[in-house]
Structures are given as C-alpha cells and as structure tokens.
C-alpha cells in the first residue's frame, strides 16, 4: 500500500513539474502537440479500411515491399541480436496534408526508398509489430528527411501499440517528457498500410541517437578518454559486445545489460569504457 502511494505521488509531482515548466518554456522551443493541432472534423473521417475509400485526419503511411516479408521476427532458436541488422528495401509514401483528410489517392508529401526491419525484443512476436526504417536514395545511401514536421533524420521508428490498449501511453509520455527535456523523442500518430493492407494506428517516433535535432552532444574526437555517451539497456547479445561493469549488472536490478550505443563499439576503448562505467 505504501509503495502504491509513493508511485502515485511521484506521478502527480511529475505532472505538476511538467505543467510549471511548460509555462516558462521559450515559445519557439514549445513542444508541438499533435492532438491539440488538428482541426479537421473527426466525423468526416472514413471508417473504411479499404485503401480506395480510406481517409483520415491523421497522417497516412504506405509501405510497399513487393510482397517480400519484412525481416526481424525471431525464428525457433534464433537470437534477436542475430537479425538486428537484417533489412529489406521498400518504398514509402507519406500523406500529410494540413487541414485536409489524408487519402491514398492523394499526392504524397513524401516519397522515398527505405531500408526496413521489425524492431523490438519480445514485441517481435506480437500480431502487430513495430518497425525501424532508414530513408535511402535510389543508390541505397542513407539520407535525412523531415517527417510530419519533425527534424530531419535518416533513421525512424514506427511503434505499433499492441499491449497498450489505450494506444496512448508512449505518445503521452514522450510528449510529457518533451515538456521537461527537449531531447525527448518527438512523436506523431499515423495510420499505416503495408502492401495495400491496413495495419492500424502507429506512432512515428524519432530514434534516440546523437545528432542535430536529436540528442545534441559534444562529438567524440576519437582520442580522449572522456566523451559524451549514450547507453542502452538491452538483452545480452550472442555477438562480441562489451557491456558496462556497473551496479545494475552485478546487483541484478535489471533483466539485461548496458551497452554503449555512442560513441559505438568500433570506437570504444578500455579507458573510455571505464570512464562511462563510473
């Protein structure tokens, strides 16, 4: 009972802090709230999921693979880390006309080649999976594009709410976090079609990464034993990955390991690993 009161109190304090901080944020840095910005009448939205008659007040994303299965669903005896770099090429179109209903028969505002795979760990087995994709040019080189008003980048996440039946948890908490810290991932609701079949409501999200418009840190110079860094709590890999020696691992406080995502495995040194671990 006491722990429940503590958790409730922390949530209330977090909400109050976000409210107070939002009143003092520079208007130019005010986080865009998608649900407060759309004025198209919801009743005009078609309830049909047929691509010929479908329409939505939300952005619509169409992905075409030519019938090729998107890789990433784990098979029997296969480790998640074995397939995290398996991508296929596909075509993506995004329909996002401000003040209009979005239809697949309309002119897309964005059209690009992408490399795409299924993302997640246990969520890879869900009926509705999430995706990670990267914009590319016709030659397969990554390129940065603006998506639904969010900062340009090449790598994006399509989160498919499955266990969260409200469909709001990640969208709500990312936006709330963004009112407190501007580097929290930006998000937009959208509706997704895959090879002409409706997949449901998704959340288009920025991937947590170092760079302009994402987490803007001091770039590692490759020489110093001190660096800005990003770590990821993840399941242990079967690959040769050096994990951090830290309290969470030897005290078994989390079911996973902490892996350095930036500066990255190819640039990490024993001295830098020790610095980050401390």
Describe the function of each predicted region:
Residues 2-278:
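Phosphate/dinucleotide-binding and metal-coordinating scaffold of catalytic cores
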